[in-house]
Amino acid sequence: MATAEELQKTWELTVQVDQRAGDESMKFKLRVKGNLHIGGLMLKLVEKIIAPQDWSDHALWWEQRNCWLLKTHWTLDKYGVQSDADLRYTPQHKPLCIQLPNMKYIKLTVSYSTVVFRAVAEICRTLNIRRSEELSLLKPTDENSKKKKKKDKNPVLEDIIDMDVVSGGSGGSASPLYSKTMIPTYDPENGMPVSATSMWFGDNPLTSSQPNLPPAELAKMYQPMSMVDKAVINAGWLDSSRSLMEQGIQEEDRLLLRFKYHCFFDLNPKYDAVRITQLYEQARWTILLEEIECTDEEMLMFASLQYHICKLTMSTEPLDFSNEPEIDEVEAALSNLEVTLEGGHADRILEDITDIPQLADSLRLFRPKRLTLRAYKDYWFVFKDTTISYYKNKEVSSGEPIEQFHLRGCEVVPDVNVTDRKFGIKLLLPVADGMNEVYIRCDNENQYAKWKAACILASKGKTMAYSSYRAEVKNIQSFLKMKSMAPPPGQAAPELETMEMNAECFVSPRYSKKHKTKQLTCRILEALHNIARLSLMDAKMRFIQAWQSLPEFGIKYYIVRFRGSKKDELLGISYNRLIRIDISTGSPVTTWRFANMKQWNVNWEIQQVTIDFDQGVSIAFSCASCDCKVVHEYIGGYIFLSTRSKDQNETLDEELFLKLTGGQE
């Protein structure tokens, strides 16, 4: 019997116990002391529960404080738990409904107690997606679709893939989606499976592309119409340094798994079947729902690639890699992708070049001014280092130029229509009070490819002496070839009857309204001539590569208020730069590159982000469309991704990621 003095030191604590499989929860009252550690409390609780079961996955959740009590050696006093605390003894792993980039839903048991960064890594391991640091979880914009009762007659719910059933596992540690008897062995040098995907990857529904929706269904889906709408969507990214439960996510809630950071490292068709397919699907939906802007010509190119991929998907065995290109061709494609993305490989200066190459051509120039028609004038242009100079003609090019453009930190925007033989480059040059526009017009594809590639490198502070220049030129030439509507010489005109699907399925609803079905079919089949020989995986890679070439690729928008300003503006965050954008016109005002960033800080009390760049440039802003933690994490995440290299294995440096992206804690 406890003495009266001992009873005065103890107090009553109520704990609700959640059980699995839909069993009703139980409530228990325990007499405890403040010096009782969490592990001892759980032991007391389990001893009092009559129903025998495995409680190893259970942990204590504190409702009022919205936190897990995971440090079992901490006492109740240290956590601040008192008699009025509302504690739940609940499973740490719970089912979650996840919409994949291909818009399909899966149900998967994930950890609700670990930080989201680690939970996403668990999800990607189960789905066999490498480089989980590139993905994250996003709250759907329609909160009504977040929580659905099981009795709801929702056609989407009936199509959910239960991954615990598919992978033959359940509970805390879901099994990866491959045969347990054929688990791949990973090379410690590069983190790659020793055997090819086709050898160990099972019959995986996630490697096949989804059929395109009928036009009527596509039209019903939500389409962001402005940058402000996109800013609302981007506010929904979960905090990677907090758990699902801490962010209000409950059992069987719905979240979207998406590629958050558009810096795709080491894409390999031999081992990344799921990753490439899901990346293609995310790219495809951004085109169809007009979440990213593209020209009519580009829309047709994407439509022809989708049609080609659909045909190959229906006619090819899911794991037939016999038609895939040999490794040298794959490496070439990957090289192009890495050039576009700065995906972590080291760009080096070519050893055999003693003098930095330069370009010299007769081009046309236009400087937009108010109330003037667009009139291009011929000049002699010289591109040297990271600077463009132009002269009245070639004969006077040894003297002083009319003007020079310094391209470091500029924006390079294509102004191209291959069908109309228009090959233009728009340069947005940073100046003290914003950006100056300059238009340069080239004569042909090859000239355009060389000059645009040089401009892209110069904007990053690199010259044509870097190894990536030649690959960038080839990448641009390949992109132009895909956009060309002209069939190869001697090729007969397409027969409209040969198209087995509705052409309107492959373009955005807005674009389909501009053209009759017959006209659209004809144009897609014409564009198909340039890609008809691509294999399934190569076609997906080309689609991704073309998506990366769009001016708006990878830019996430947020509504912010800059220090000293009295109006809201847009901040665009890309994989290599920050862009200040006029919210009324959508035009870039200033660009700051991550390469020039010295440091950034967050004042959590006033929710303000401050960033210091080279040459004494400093900016500060508060966020209007989201918590500043979302923007802080985006910046830190891209800095983290820039530290990756092929020499490292696939072990994630979680500590470094959380250090760069974490909050006040």
Language model regions located:
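Intrinsically disordered, Pro/Ser/Thr-rich cytosolic linker and juxtamembrane tail regions that serve as
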Residues: 1-665
